[in-house]
């Protein structure tokens, strides 16, 4: 998560400053950084620090949260307030009055909605240069 913040900030710096030679490794700062994390790991402090930094710095990022309702063998109710990281993070939600993070939620088994949601997330991050969280729920564990 901390690397995600650094890479997103680099894109913002390239966009806001005319850096000689940056055209060799930047498209005028219009890159977005993609990161991924499991729902159980969102209970760790570094996740909240990274999300807050993304919101404060307004960096172009898409953060994917894969949620299978469990953290190893513990249900969400035992490690996440409100049993939903989207609900926990709702205070970060961007509004017309203040900057923040766009939070999208989609079911992992709904392929068409996944395509639509990710297309929308990419557009928001790239065009408006703000962070987006995509909370993918109702996933199954690989071994059952």
Where do the language-model regions lie?
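Glycine-rich ThDP/TPP pyrophosphate-binding loop and its adjacent helix/strand module
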Residues: 2-144
């Amino acid at each position: 998560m901390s690397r995600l913040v650094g890479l997103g900030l680099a894109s913002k710096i390239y966009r806001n400053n005319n850096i000689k030679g940056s055209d060799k490794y930047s498209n005028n700062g219009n890159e977005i950084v993609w990161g991924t994390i499991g729902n159980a790991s969102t209970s760790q402090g570094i996740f909240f620090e990274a999300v807050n930094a993304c919101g404060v710095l307004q960096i172009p990022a898409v953060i994917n949260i894969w949620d299978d309702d469990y953290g190893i063998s513990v249900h969400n109710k035992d490690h996440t307030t409100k049993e939903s990281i989207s609900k926990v993070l709702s205070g970060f939600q961007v509004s017309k009055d203040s900057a923040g993070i766009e939070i999208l939620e989609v079911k992992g088994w709904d392929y068409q909605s996944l395509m639509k949601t990710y297309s929308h997330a990419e557009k928001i991050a790239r065009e408006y240069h703000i962070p987006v969280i995509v909370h993918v729920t109702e996933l199954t564990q690989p071994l059952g």
